[in-house]
A protein has these predicted regions:
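Hotspots on structured nucleic-acid-binding interfaces, especially in canonical RNA/DNA-binding domains
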Residues: 30-40
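Conserved acyl-donor/pantetheine-binding loop and adjacent beta-alpha core of acyl/acetyltransferases
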Residues: 67-113
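Conserved GNAT acetyl-CoA-binding A-motif
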Residues: 130, 137-152
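A short helix-loop-beta-strand connector motif used in the catalytic cores of GNAT acetyltransferases and
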Residues: 42-54, 61-64, 70-79
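Conserved acetyl-CoA-binding loop-helix of GNAT-fold acetyltransferases
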Residues: 122-135
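A short, internal acetyl-CoA/4′-phosphopantetheine-binding micro-motif in the GNAT/acyltransferase core
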Residues: 112-122
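Short hydrophobic/aromatic beta-strand element in the GNAT-like acyltransferase core
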Residues: 50-54, 65, 108, 113, ...
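Conserved N-terminal entry element of GNAT/NAT acetyltransferase domains
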Residues: 1-29
Length: 155
């Protein structure tokens, strides 16, 4: 069995992707994500579809890339909404439940793309990103954010 070194004790920085970041050596091994980060991400950033962030190590190597966008959880049917509210009420403060139940949509932040460089996968970097996003938006004060949504690939 291959021994893996977890990166939990190594310093990372998370920064907004800049025009100076060279993505050409970055590959995660998923064709769809690699194509997006090499061919489409700059256009999506330019037109404010997403904001893109990089995770770098001390040597300034890009270890992961991810995108964030505002989102909302909206339901097509009252039954789906009621199921969602019922499941969510156990994590909502009692003083807010009545207001929560009346909402027609629930503000969220979306992780639209998350790619970890192929040679450092399964070492906790994706978990680091998720914890960063959760921690950031638990304290976020600029706009409402009650949930985090994730666009996932089935691979």
């Amino acid at each position: 069995m291959e021994e893996r070194t977890l990166f939990s004790d190594i310093d990372f920085s998370i920064n907004l992707l800049s025009d100076h970041d060279d993505l050409s050596p970055f590959f995660c091994g998923c064709e769809e994500l690699d194509f997006f980060f090499h061919k489409e991400v700059n256009l999506c950033v330019k037109y404010k579809y997403v904001s893109t962030y990089s995770v770098k190590n001390k040597e300034n190597d890009i270890l992961a890339l991810f995108t964030l966008a505002h989102d909302s959880v909206v339901f097509q049917s009252l039954e789906d909404k009621n199921d969602f509210v019922e499941e969510s009420c156990c994590i909502i403060d009692k003083e807010y439940i009545e207001t929560f139940v009346r909402q027609s949509a629930f503000p969220a932040i979306n992780i639209g793309h998350l790619a970890v460089r192929h040679d450092v996968q399964s070492r906790g970097i994706g978990t680091f990103v998720l914890n960063f996003v959760i921690g950031t938006f638990m304290e976020y004060k600029m706009s409402g954010c009650q949930f985090i949504t994730v666009d996932s690939l089935n691979n």
